[in-house]
Amino acid sequence: MSNTGSARTEEFTKGTGYEATKPNNDTDDDAKQNYPSKEPHMKLGDYTEETSFVDDSIFKREELTPDRNSPANDVEKMEVPKPTPQWMKLKDEGKLGKHRKNRLRRPGRFPVRQESTIDIPGLTVSKRTENDSNNASYGIREKLIIILVGIPATGKSYIGSKLSRYYNWLKYNCRFFSVGDKRREEGASTYSMSADFFDIKNEETFKFRENVALETLEDLLHWMIHENGVIGILDATNSTHERRKHLYDRISKEADIGIMFLESLCTDDILFEENIKLKIKGPDYEGYDTESALKDLRERVDLYKKYYEPLDERDEQLPFLQYVKVINVGIKVVTHNIEGFLAGQAVYFMLNLNIQKRQIWLTRPGESLDTVAGRIGGDASLTPIGKQYAQDLANFMDRQRVLWQLRYTNDLASTNKRFSLSEASSFNVWSSVRKRAIETIEFFNPDSYNVKKIRLLNDLNLGSREGLTLREFSEKYPDEFDVIKRKDYAYRFSGQGGESYLDVIHRLQPLIVEIERSSGNILVVSHRIVSNILMTYFLNYHPEDIIDVGLPLHTLFCIESDRYGTTCMAYRYDAANRQFIKDPMFDLRKRT
């Protein structure tokens, strides 16, 4: 290249902070800020095999003559950019912290870690290698390990189990690995598991606990690598930076597995005491009386508090590390460096986490003309019996609402809980936008209930098969009809608007999160398949049970959920006597 071109380039870049040589040590601070790297800027010939990702030959073609008409040769005519004024510069501009430098990707054709993008089962497909043809995870390429952090009785296991249920319901292959379960399995015959067992000064038990934690991690890694796992949740206290770094270093040896710490902190004394009373009902205190269990658990908590190291700047130094701090089971959420799609889903869920006790009622629309004719789908109105069901449903819910408020008031008086009574009076009524569903909620007073029609609650769209009877469907399209029996959740029915089960699941995702967020009671009036999908989530059924769960016509289900667990009660409608009768023996998995 000509010297003239170099001179023009030097003149063009002069004063912009992009000169091709490093400034002298006696330059002013502003000039130094333009050179965050300790190494001189590279010239065209200074590249190395480590940093080069382009064919070397392109730098050796000096015989090529530049186009004289190119705008690049009019550099003298171009206005030289002015330096950035000092007042416009960021406080730490040019001074990347160590943890920020670790996130930069090494130049090259193959980056060290590929960026995570959207992965939704049944809706996205990632290109996979020939040796990774198993479709059990529906083409999900990203993998994530969530490591729980926190002292006992802060709610971390509760949060982890809720996350596991949420991911599995969305059809991500997720599994919960409990270090405590493995500790009890391997050490119950040797150790007493009392508070002294958890003392970090007890070298024997400390070594045993460390080994159990690493063994559990190895089980998790084996499952993710060899059994098509997508998300693994490691449940343990992981209370020191040294332990967390050890886990991080081991996981980092495996390719393309994201790591996220999830720390649960509890600063609310009332909530912490409730967690303490809940934890003594767990397997660590089987055979203990209440007083002895409380005493031992408090001693264990005091030991952990003495040595506990919360997530801080030291953890942030670990390359690519993501973490979430959940304070008081979702009252406050703090995040750091959340990049992956799967990690983002966890944060989204944490922001809507709610431990308030509440009722979730589910029912199908009343009997419709299409129901009588045996047709699937469609948009028919209710029959006279269906309208009667709608009227009696509203009356029954009015009575149940009063009973709930009485229970709630008594609960507040007896336990001094921290929630306000006004929350007990909140009641939402949702339905799909189909005629039969809208007519089923017709008798709910909008002045007393928050009534909404939501298109997301529409039933599975069978495309061109809508309006057929089951017999017509099975005879004309036996292959598609067999899809239901084969439980192919990714199969999308043909015809305009046709959906798959996975389409419906992800269509319902924002409603699930909204129900999790809401502190009030709710009645959902939707259709058979949608109701099945909702029931499998709230009752934590296996994801493959979606098709097997049966919600009969004119049956009402009440789910009561809080951090202590979930209960479900069925009420059958007696049309002759116009009343709902509690049925404690009803089995959801038996189709009726």
From Swiss-Prot:
Synthesis of fructose 2,6-bisphosphate. ATP binds at residues 150-157. InterPro entries: 6Pfruct_kin, 6Phosfructo_kin, His_Pase_superF_clade-1, His_PPase_superfam, P-loop_NTPase. Disulfide bonds: none annotated. The active site is at residues 235, 266, 527. Transmembrane segments: none annotated. Beta-D-fructose 6-phosphate binds at residue 300. Its EC number is 2.7.1.105. It is found in: Cytoplasm; Nucleus. This is Probable 6-phosphofructo-2-kinase C222.13c. Residues 1-80 are annotated as: Disordered. It comes from Schizosaccharomyces pombe (strain 972 / ATCC 24843). One of its GO terms (molecular function) is 6-phosphofructo-2-kinase activity. The keyword Chloroplast does not apply.
